[in-house]
Amino acid sequence: IIAFMGLARLGFIIDFIPVPAITAFMVGSAISICSGQVKGLLGQTGNIDTSAPSYRIIIDTLKDLPTAQGYDAAMGLIALAALYALRSGFNYGAEKKPSFAKIFFFLGALRTVFIIALFALISLGINQHRRDNPAFALVGNVPKGFDQAGVPVLKADVIKLIVSQLPACVICLLIEHIAVAKTFGRVNNYTIDPSQELIAIGITNLLGPFLGAFPATGAFSRSAIQSKSGARSPFTGIITAIVVLIAMYTLTSGLYYIPKATLSAVIIHAVGDLIVPPNTIYQFWLIAPLDAVI
């Protein structure tokens, strides 16, 4: 669908999506993702349907708080607190020492990797001799390489499941990718062609399933890091891909002991910034009351 829109030069449609609508969509997505990760963060064993509407997930999560596991919650909540503490510390350092601002930025960008590695080592020390009965939930075995490579097969029952979610998926992909492209185009003083962007992301998602890939779209965090690094062309994506390939074939065994609660903390931390403060809505109201209502 996305590739067709790009080939049909329908990218101009994106320009008609108002900023408040994009903001509201991103906030809603962030709330949905965060609410679905609380179960893993606390190690809850209750029957919580994380694919249900956000309000239902929040209600079920609160009801099932007694099922939270202490060790899982500790690994998740401490990791989440550490991520925010590191970010605040590096931001404070950048403000106090502007000459080292870029160094603090890169240290802040690496905080997620540091926390995952730290808690994986802690988990290794605790669970090394009790793999069959770990103290808390672990990621477990991660297959090496492209074990799912092949011609994808879409069955009728799978199509029925995704049809109802397809419009939301397309809108989410469009908004996120174009938002990333426009943001960094504005920062680095270049103009993007929305139709060209749609063709690129559409073809990527057409070829991805042959290697067992998840649907792809623009990434705020990685784009920010590349922009700060001085990247000026898509060639940086090739460098990233090579590093990921090496990791897929050599480092997967090291992922076994990563606590699931820590991964939930990382996800919540990553998407939490998409939830805008209340004064943003007030600013929309000052500019255009109708847009704020929308």
State where each predicted segment sits:
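Transmembrane helical cores of multi-pass ion-transport proteins
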Residues: 1-294
